[in-house]
Design a protein with these regions (language model features):
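N-proximal low-complexity "stem/linker" segments adjacent to membrane-targeting elements
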Residues: 1-28
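Cell-envelope/extracellular polymer assembly enzymes that use nucleotide-activated donors
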Residues: 5-8, 36, 179
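Conserved short acidic donor-positioning loop in nucleotide-sugar-dependent glycosyltransferases
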Residues: 27, 42-43, 47, 68-69
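A conserved acidic beta->alpha catalytic loop
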Residues: 33, 41-50, 90
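Glycine-rich, basic loop-to-helix element that forms the pyrophosphate-binding segment
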Residues: 65-81
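Short aromatic/hydrophobic "clamp" motif used to bind/position activated sugar donors
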Residues: 86
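Conserved donor NDP-sugar-binding/catalytic core segment of glycosyltransferases
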Residues: 94, 98-130
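Conserved nucleotide-sugar donor-binding catalytic segment
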Residues: 133-228, 237
Length: 324
């Protein structure tokens, strides 16, 4: 009889002593015992160390020392993990009751790389649930799934070997989960992702959480991820230049992701951004760049409807002196 699957749960932590006890309690209250709890603290100066010491008998490994941020902490935790299934949860979020038992019941490692369930959002206290109850959605193609920008990371568990092969990109401090998810999709597609209707986590919103205080930084990093995807698809410079407008970081260096899924899976993403770029270049009167983006949209199956024909006439049939 095979051994029961082991879950590794990593908590990256920094000055969240106020919320950490509840996070730890949500894990040790699970009705499945074959798990390990790894806490990587970035040298907290609040009550975090006292909390960790209080729960030390339930913690497999912990360390408190300065690090380079959340992504680095997850990377350090991954080096300590020995489980078959791995996820991280922030030090202010909660694992839902029964989550571990459900995950091992449905996670067939021969069939799946990823299992994702629902995530409830709540404001400050678990008694104050937000209206959102979300699960990562899979669309008909990888490109359409990417356009939805939804992962619900606390409720997304990876097969350990897959997580290790992908790793966590330390360049991202806010969207490391989006980067991880998109790199996975580009390599493996969606066929080995299992969506379950089970509630796996609670995501806390509060006045000092990154989600509440750093929205512009989230968007800037998300723009880098999307740029990397299109860069990896070898899209023309005109489209990449449009994408780079949303990236404020002057030192941004693009990363080429490994792409193994068929081209047709990614056409919805390319044509959607090509059309956005077309509108932008029309507004800025850059006709040559607009033409390039119009071709990209059509090459990626933008439908031959009224919207496309208007743009085609504008750029290929009417003389430029007649255009505004």
């Amino acid at each position: 009889m095979p051994s029961p699957l082991k879950i590794s749960i990593i908590i990256p932590s920094y000055n969240q002593g106020k919320y950490l006890p509840e996070t730890i309690k949500s894990i040790i209250a699970q009705d499945y015992s074959n798990y390990e709890l790894i806490i990587i603290d970035g040298g907290s100066t609040d009550d975090t160390l006292n909390v960790i010491r209080h729960f030390h008998s339930h913690i497999t490994y912990w360390v408190s020392e300065p690090d380079r941020g959340q992504s680095h902490a997850i990377h350090k935790g991954l080096a300590q993990a020995t489980g078959d299934i791995i996820n991280w949860i922030n030090s202010d979020d909660l694992v839902a009751p029964g989550a571990f038992e459900h995950i091992v019941a449905v996670f067939d490692l021969h069939k799946y790389d990823v299992v994702c369930g629902y995530c409830h959002y709540f404001i400050n206290d678990i008694a104050h649930l937000d209206l959102r109850n979300e699960r990562m959605g899979l669309q008909p193609t990888v490109g359409e799934t990417m356009l939805h920008r939804q992962i619900n990371q606390p409720s997304t568990y990876f097969k350990a070997s897959v997580f290790r092969a992908l790793g966590v990109n330390e360049r991202f401090h806010f969207t490391m989960d989006l980067d991880l998810w998109y790199r996975y999709l580009l390599q493996a597609g969606q066929s080995r992702v299992l969506l379950t209707d089970f509630l796996l986590s609670y995501f806390r919103l509060h006045e000092s959480s990154k989600t509440m205080t750093s929205s512009p930084l989230f968007e800037a990093e998300a723009a880098q991820v999307f740029y990397n995807v299109l860069y990896s698809l070898s899209q023309p410079q005109e489209l990449l230049a449009f994408m780079q407008r949303s990236i404020p970081e002057a030192k941004f260096v693009p990363t080429r992701y490994s792409v193994k899924v068929p081209t047709h899976e990614l056409r919805p993403l390319a044509r959607a951004y090509a059309w956005e770029a077309l509108i932008f270049y029309n507004q800025t009167k850059n006709r040559s760049a607009a033409r390039v983006c119009l071709r990209i949209a059509r090459q990626n199956n933008w439908p031959l409807g009224v919207r496309f024909l208007r743009q085609w006439l504008k750029h290929y049939a009417l003389p430029s002196r007649l255009l505004p």
